[in-house]
Amino acid sequence: MIFRKAEASEAETVLALYRAVIGTPFCVWDASYPGETEIQDDLAAGTLYVLERNGEVIGAISIVPENETDDLDCWKVKENVREFARVAVRPDCQQQGLSFYLVDGIIRELKKQHTAAIHIAVAKSNIPAQKLYRKMGFDFCGEADLFGNHYFLCEMIL
């Protein structure tokens, strides 16, 4: 398996991946999000990553170009922080532990960038993601209603 930055030529592949997970258990996305705008913004910022297996993109994750939850009071670290979002694994590849490789790849990338902490908002209904983030060492430090859903707010100090 290869974790790497996405290439511009893979925009349609990533969009198809995002569309494929809509409606699957634990996914709170809809047809309007995430879409082409988020993919193009992430590609332009160099913050879209993919997980490749046997030459096929089977997962995607993004470092958010601009943090969306910085103003929330729950965070212990507020400077030099990055968020990740849009974690997706192709439906036929789910329940194989592949989200771990996506999140681990982002953690390694952000450590290289000397990031102080990572923030993530995880949907309250997404039990598998909550378990993964706890297992990987994220602290659950708050809750918030964002983007029409209820989220747990998680932080990892690097």
Describe the residue ranges of each PLM region.
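A short beta-loop-alpha structural element at the N-terminal edge
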Residues: I2-V14
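Conserved acetyl-CoA-binding loop-helix of GNAT-fold acetyltransferases
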Residues: V89, Q95-R108, K131-K135
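Conserved GNAT acetyl-CoA-binding A-motif
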Residues: V103, L110-A121
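Conserved GNAT-fold acetyl-CoA-binding loop/helix
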Residues: L15, R19-D41
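Conserved acyl-donor/pantetheine-binding loop and adjacent beta-alpha core of acyl/acetyltransferases
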Residues: S62-R86, Q94
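Conserved acetyl-CoA-binding loop of GNAT-fold acetyltransferases
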Residues: R19, R134-E143
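Conserved beta-strand-loop-alpha-helix junction that forms the acyl-donor binding cleft
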Residues: I120-Q130, L146-H150, I157
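Conserved beta-hairpin
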Residues: T47-I63
